[in-house]
Amino acid sequence: VNKMKYADLHIHSSYSDGSKRPEEIIDSAIKNNIKCISITDHDSIASQYVTKNNYDDLLIIPGIELSTEYNNMELHILGYFIDVENNDLKSLVNELNIQRIKRVESILYNLRKYNINLELKDLEVDNDSTVGRSHIANAMVKKGYFDNYKSAFRSFLVQGKPGYVKGFRLNYRDCIDVINNSGGVPILAHPGQIYRKLEVENILKELKCFGLKGVEVYHPSHTQGDVNKFYNLSKKYKLCVTGGSDYHG
């Protein structure tokens, strides 16, 4: 996105469902003249301990992406400038990790009914990384059940397919509170992906009342029409504007 040419505030590393380690992401950002990044792993702050070093040519903002529940919808909330030593944030992340493992175990149980026999130990997960469907799909390929990741994921792991188990979601108000209380800035991620797009303005109004500070206006999934709409809504409700690539490697 041109307006975010020198910053990328939405990146996933191998500590969640990205393929690159934080060190590789940092090297790539510096080589590509990016001046500011935030690694926003799903439900994880582990990468933040790796990126604490100071770099002359790169500002790294501590970040996270949380999956939340709002009126039976999934909303993703980004948190920037979080204090990774905050006890409430640590407790939240720990609970999310426990729930992720439970979900993965349920998915593996479902897959065994179709003679796809995988165990937790078969999933290649870095220490302190969050485990998820991407790790299962990779294991399905490695064990020879599928030829490629996309086929494995789409055949068994998306909603409506036999391996799917709904993910655990936190209440959106709790997530916004924890981000704010940890010194962070809560941002609504990729609003263009909300399946009831007509409700976005009402969602923004309500979330602002509970402490939302901004909107991810610039995202690869957004059309120019989306960008214009969300930019204008951000200005209308005095919310900050952010953007990022949602890079996974």
Enumerate the language-model features and the residues they cover.
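An N-terminally biased module of ancient metal coordination in phosphate/nucleic-acid-related enzymes
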Residues: 1-74, 156-158, 162, 171-178, ...
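Extended substrate/RNA-proximal surfaces in nucleic-acid metabolism proteins
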Residues: 53-202
